């Protein structure tokens, strides 16, 4: 466990890191980034917690991370099978008029969040899987590694 200053700064920075990870995930179909990159940014928040508070404090979150990883995988597969009537992975929400289904205006990068069809939703599914996977790795490294018996 670190000093009071490190723990206080971690409490301030932790939600900002999660929000920035969500931003990278959400804008993945418009800018460089996406589910994996945003998930890695958000999972780095777990490493920040590990350094500031120690491994025992994170040990209780292994089950939540496992559930989050399962949900991300199932959400991705469900979105992939939405277009099975036409083509596997077909962007069935594009230009449908609903959520994430606005028609894409002409131009190289319109910059509209709702113009991606199923791609932003798949980015979120991948992001959840990466957050949970990398977060689990960080927690397990903290619990089982790092002992120096010299």
Residue spans for each PLM region:
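Short, non-helical or kinked segments that cap or interrupt transmembrane helices
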Residues: 29-43
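Flexible extramembrane loops and terminal tails that flank transmembrane helices
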Residues: 1-20, 24-27, 49-150
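Gly/Ser/Thr-rich active-site loops/lids in small-molecule metabolic enzymes
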Residues: 41-51
